[in-house]
Amino acid sequence: MEEADRILIHSLRQAGTAVPPEVQTLRAFTTELVVEAVVRCLRVINPDVGSGLSHLLPPAMSARFRLAMSLAQACMDLGYPLELGYQNFLYPSEPDLRDLLLFLAERLPSDASEDADQPAGDSAIFLRAIGSQIRDQLALPWVPPLLRTPKVQRLQGSALQQPFHSSRLVLPELNSSGELWEFQASPLLLPAPTQVPQLQGRAASLLEHHASQLCQHVNRDCPGDEDRVRWASRVPSQEDSRAPQQRLHKQLIEHLRQSWGPLGAPTQVRDLGEMLQTWGARAMTGVPKGSRFTHSEKFTFHLEPQVQAAQVADVPATSQRLEQDTRAAQEQELESLREQLASVNHNIEEVEADMKTLGINLVQVETECRQSELSVAEQEQALRLKSRTVELLPDGAANLAKLQLVVESSAQRLIHLASQWEKHRVPLLAEYRHLRRLQDCRELESSRRLAEIQELHHSVRAAAEEARRKEEVYKQLVSELETLPKDVSRLAYTQRILEIVGNIRKQKEEITKILSDTKELQKEINSLSGKLDRTFAVTDELVFKDAKKDDAVRKAYKYLAALHENCSQLIQTIEDTGTIMREVRDLEEQIETEMGKKTLSNLEKICEDYRALRQENAGLLGRVREA
């Protein structure tokens, strides 16, 4: 344990605890050093909790109790599994202190010495970021594409793609207010969304029309580009050459770059706000109320939704009628099928009810048939007996004499069989009793051996548990060794760990040897006990036969019985002595454990703290009286 204490003290020094060089074991820890070590570890593990605790033990007893209770609560919040109170800090014992400091040392963060070996620079940081992102993505569960939500499909690029189908839209030119008014007042043209019958092609058509308007805006000031403008204002065809397309594509990209500029420029937002303000002002300071143009504009815009609604309603009227007829036919067919299904279900229910009643009747008929068969059999038996009796009635005296002879012969036969049974029963009974005695002896021997085997199993289990515990300690020490910083010299720790492992192996070999010796000794004891019992039984039987005839043999028999009794007492005394020696060893171990807990020193500290607490209370009472 001294090496484990040294490793633990080294960890506490790394956490910032000022452990004196002369302190080499936890037994030498004082109350002040215990409080400082726990507070330093708490500050490293959880700075929010440890920053509010003082690593110096206050002189006042009440403050000491409060600090000890705060430390106990902080350790319990970290998940300390054992019971913890102020006494573990003010009056510590070595085993409890070792468990507490081991618990805190396990939760100390390891040094990031591995980061020092990694390369620095932007490329290394970028590669580490890529690696962390890949690890995070690999940690997520994989979901098949068909089971993903639409949002996830759009984000991961697994959504179903729609082909780009555009249609030509007929819209007014924006450079003439008269043409716009005529277009909106025309009853022959539908709105832009309703001009495309397919829902998937509306967005594509609007984008295509917007691209053509953008091309016209770009090329209206360039001479000689009328062909390109005319090409951009219609749907692209296969016979157009690639060169104008590439030139127009470059012009669009250049125009977008010049017009939009850097992303998030505040000038565009300002221009948009000014434009909205000018439109709002223009709407507020518009034409006077009573002008003829205002009335005609209102009349036009009020009529336009009705005209468009009529146009939209006329187009799908025929399709709606066809759908209504189809639905009516389907509903009629469905209604007839439902009626047929209801009638079939009703017939099935009637048949099932008839089957249930017939089944009940069948069970009743079968029961009656079985009862009638039983009664018929009984009547046949009675009839057979009566017929035999009637046959014997004509010659009654002779038949009675014959019957008497048959009865007497049967009685003689029973007596003969009983005598034969007695002849066979006596030796069988003696053999049974002998076998029963042998079985009892075997059961006693087997129970004794079973008790011995259970004791051996218990000892083996205890040894295996001890070996398993030492293996766990070994693994824990190896893991702690791996978590130590790289700059610390590991040679001494490695050698000491190898020595500990060697000692554990030696102890394991010694335990195995002791167990084997115990087994052999137990076998020898059992064999000797069996020999002794058998020898005594044979001697007892031989001497007992001659003890009735000879007085000397009778005295020898008495001496033999006394010797056997004395040997039994001697064996029992030896077993009691061994039990007492084991209890003495257990008591010595308990005394050593109690000595390690420093009970006397803790009692002296408690008495001193009690006196100091009484003095503080007396001083406080004096202050209260003076006040």
Swiss-Prot record:
The entry's keywords: Coiled coil, Cytoplasm, Cytoskeleton, Endosome, Phosphoprotein, Protein transport, Transport, Ubl conjugation pathway
Superkingdom classification of source: Eukaryota
Positions of post-translational Phosphoserine modification: 410
Residue ranges of the region described as Sufficient for interaction with COMMD1: 1-321
One GO location term (cellular component): endosome
One of the Pfam families matching this protein, by short name: CCDC22_N
Presence of the UniProt keyword Transport in the record: yes
Family per similarity comment: Belongs to the CCDC22 family.
Name the UniProt record assigns to this protein: Coiled-coil domain-containing protein 22
The organism of origin for this protein: Mus musculus (Mouse)
Gene: Ccdc22
